[in-house]
Amino acid sequence: MSQMLHIEIPNFGNTVLGCLNEQRLLGLYCDVSIVVKGQAFKAHRAVLAASSLYFRDLFSGNSKSAFELPGSVPPACFQQILSFCYTGRLTMTASEQLVVMYTAGFLQIQHIVERGTDLMFKVSSPHCDSQTAVIEDAGSEPQSPCNQLQPAAAAAAPYVVSPSVPIPLLTRVKHEAMELPPAGPGLAPKRPLETGPRDGVAVAAGAAVAAGTAPLKLPRVSYYGVPSLATLIPGIQQMPYPQGERTSPGASSLPTTDSPTSYHNEEDEEDDEAYDTMVEEQYGQMYIKASGSYAVQEKPEPVPLESRSCVLIRRDLVALPASLISQIGYRCHPKLYSEGDPGEKLELVAGSGVYITRGQLMNCHLCAGVKHKVLLRRLLATFFDRNTLANSCGTGIRSSTSDPSRKPLDSRVLNAVKLYCQNFAPSFKESEMNVIAADMCTNARRVRKRWLPKIKSMLPEGVEMYRTVMGSAAASVPLDPEFPPAAAQVFEQRIYAERRGDAATIVALRTDAVNVDLSAAANPAFDAGEEVDGAGSVIQEVAAPEPLPADGQSPPQPFEQGGGGPSRPQTPAAAARRPEGTYAGTL
C-alpha cells in the first residue's frame, strides 16, 4: 500500500485573491468592465459572481464584456465594494454606512449587509457595573497579502470592517467609569487603569492619565471587534448604548432577490450563515476564557442571544438614504424618513398592535431596495425564526400530505406584514404573499430535515437514550435537530445525575436498550415526501438544554414508544413560553 503525501499551504485562498486583486489594479487578465456613471471598473467575472448574487444572475447566459449599473450607484462606493470582493475588507467613514449598505443590498452582497447592520444596530455588553474596551490581538490573525495593515495607516484611516474574516481572539482591558483627581507632579492617581499584565496588553491611556493630559473621566462605552476605535474615529460620540433587540436568526438566511433563478436561495446561503454563527459562538467562548482580569466559571453557561458580543460603533440617528428614497418614494413607514434612534419601536401598521424596531425595519428596506417580494421575506424572517417557520404551515393552506398538526403563522403579525407590503407595492397580490410564506416554511423544514442524520451521527453514544429517560417531558419531546454547542457539558451533567440517581433507573437504562426512531415517518414535524439532501450547512439555531431533575425528585418512568403527544407545541401561546420564540405578544 503506497504512502499518501499531503501538502497544505496556509492562507492559499487569500494569497490567490491577493494576486487577482493586484492583476485587477494593473488591468491584467480582466474579462469584464462595470460602468458606473461613465467610469469603467475592470474586474474578473468569477470573483464578482462568487461575491454577488446580482452579478451572478447578470452574467448568467450573457457574454458581454461591459455592463452598466444604474445611476443611483455612486462610483466611489462601488469602488470600495469591488475592493471588498477581492480582499474581504471594507473601509468607510461613519457617514457612508447607509450608502454602502444600500449599494451592497442592491448588488446582493450578503456579508456587507449583515455585518454592516451589526455595526449600526446591535449592542452587546450585558454588564451594568463596568464596561470594557477591547483591543485586537495583532498576532492572532494570519497575515496575508490581502489583510496586512500598516500601523501608521491604521491610526489615520477610518474603522475597517472584515465580514469574511473570523473574529480574532480578543483581549480584555477593564475601564472603570469614575472621577479621577488630577495627579500632581510627583503623585500617582488614586486608582490607575488596570492594564491586565497577564494578557500582555499595554494601554496608552494609562500613561496619558498619569501625565495629566487625558480627560479625567473615563467613558463608559465598549467597542467589540474594532481595534482602538476611540482613536481611529477622533470625533466619536462616547456615550452608552442601551440594550436593544436582536434581529431574528432567520433574517440572515433569506435571499435579496426575487428572480426565478434564485427563488430558493435560502439553502444556498446556509453555509455562509452557519459558518458566521459557528465563528461567533466559538470565539465568544474563547474570549471569555482569555479574560485574565475576571473570574470565569469552569464551565460557562451558553450565552443568550441578546447578550452576545458584537460591534458597537456609536448611537447615530438613522434615516433612509436619499438615494433609496429617490427610487422607492414615500411608500415606507413615515417615521423612516426622519432621523431617529435605531432601537425605537415603531408600529408596523397603524392600529395593528405589531411593533418592530426602527433598525430592523430599515434593515429590511436596505436589503430589499425596490423589490417588494424581498421586503416580504425580510419582514417575515424578522418576526419568525427558522424553527417557527419549520413548525408551521405558512398561511393555513395545507396539502393532503402535510402534517395536520402544523398550525398557521400568527395571523395578527402575518396580516400586518401583508398590509405593509401592499402599501409598499399596491400590485402585490395576497395569493403571491401566501405562496412566498409557504415557500419559506418548506425551505426551513427541508434544511432541518437535511441535517437531522448528520446531527444524530455527531451525538455522543447514548445521548438518545438519556434524552428519552431523563426529564419529565422526555416521552413527548423528540431529539431536537438543533443540538446545542454545549452538548458535551450537558451530557456529562446527565451522567453525573445518573450516578447519583436510583439504582433501579441505572438498571433500566443499561438493560432496556431503547432506540429513538428519527426517520420522517416517526417525526411528524417533517414531510414524508421530502428527500434528504447530501450537502448543506450547519444548523444555526440552538435549542436550550433540558433542565436536570432536582435531587429530591423521583426518577422518571422509562420511555414507552406508544405514549406521548405532539412533538412540538403548536399554538402561539405555547410558542411564547419557548426561549427560542421570536414573537410573543407585542414586539
Swiss-Prot record:
Residues 351-448 form the BEN domain. There is a cross-link at K174, K217, K299, K429, K456 (Glycyl lysine isopeptide (Lys-Gly) (interchain with G-Cter in SUMO2)). GO terms for biological process: negative regulation of cell population proliferation; negative regulation of DNA-templated transcription; negative regulation of transcription by RNA polymerase II; positive regulation of intrinsic apoptotic signaling pathway in response to DNA damage; protein homooligomerization; protein-containing complex localization; regulation of transcription by RNA polymerase II. One of its GO terms (cellular component) is nucleolus. It holds the Pfam family BEN. Keywords: Isopeptide bond, Nucleus, Repressor, Transcription, Transcription regulation, Ubl conjugation. Residues 240-272, 542-587 are annotated as: Disordered. InterPro entries: BEN_domain, BTB/POZ_dom, SKP1/BTB/POZ_sf, ZnFinger_BTB_dom_contain. It is found in: Nucleus. CDD domains: BTB_POZ_BTBD14A_NAC2. Its main location: nucleus. Residues 30-94 form the BTB domain. SMART domains: BEN, BTB. Functions as a transcriptional repressor through its association with the NuRD complex. Recruits the NuRD complex to the promoter of MDM2, leading to the repression of MDM2 transcription and subsequent stability of p53/TP53. Homooligomer; mediated by the BTB domain. Interacts with the NuRD complex. Interacts (via C-terminal part) with HDAC2. Interacts (via BTB domain) with MTA1, MTA2 and MTA3. This is Nucleus accumbens-associated protein 2. The gene is NACC2.
